[in-house]
Amino acid sequence: MTQPTHEKNHALEAARYALMRRLVPSLLHNMAGALQPISMTAAIMEKRLQSPTPDLILLGKSSTSFKAQSRDVADTFAHLATWLAPQSDQSIAVNAGVEEILGMMAREFSDRGFEIVNETKITTAEVPQTILRSVFMASLVALTDTAESPGRIIVTSIVTSVDIIGDADSSESDEISLTISLKGHPEMDKSIPVDVQRYRKLDWDDVQSLAKEEKVGIECTTHGVTLHIKNSGRVANEIKNVEVR
């Protein structure tokens, strides 16, 4: 039976909101980090101003530094805001996009005892940034949320050429397969609680909703998930829905 449109929209918006809520602590952490240099510079300026004979040259240098740091903070905040309102037409190389997301979520995964291994660094093919920031990131979170204990997260990528179906003239396009695997490791600290939650857990229904919206094929199990992305923006086949095993 086909799911009503309003129910699909509700599931999609619920998944987006849950992912955003899970992202907020990381955004706040990055904002605090960006503000730290300004705080230090302000403290130095205050100390110099309290001197009986302030050194105007040093104060001028501090003021120049303060202005430069303020611009950097503004740029950082503007960039962080794109995580909440991403541009749908923005593309990014797979290696850069994956590195960005793993860096953003590194603290949460570390706090929960997970180690991240990124093996996508040679994959320069471009994909829509919204796919990585929604489907890929949700897959990472869902996989760790459903894990019974901490482990090693391994991200790999493969680029293949596939036939595009549905055009008058059949052609080929690159398909990027991103695989996220979760493997146990004897040296992992099993005492670290996996369920350090700031909102609710993400599950595979959330991932499916986001994947369908972005036209990404997914195959998921309890030990990993593979995303099939067309960097041409066209989909070769219907999304393959695989039961979580």
Task: Describe the predicted segments one by one.
Residues 2-3, 8-12, 16-23, 31-71, ...:
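Histidine phosphotransfer helical core of two-component systems
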Residues 21-42, 128-156, 200-214:
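Conserved ATP-binding N-box helix of the HATPase_c
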Residues 37, 41-44, 57-112:
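Conserved DHp (HisKA) dimerization/phosphotransfer helix of two-component histidine kinases, i.e.
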Residues 90-107, 135-141, 163-170:
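Short beta-to-alpha transition helix within the HATPase_c
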Residues 115-124:
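Conserved catalytic submotifs in the C-terminal HATPase_c
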Residues 163-208, 229-231, 238-242:
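Glycine-rich/acidic phosphate-handling loop/turn and adjacent ATP-lid/helix
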Residues 212-227:
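Glycine-rich ATP-binding loops of the HATPase_c
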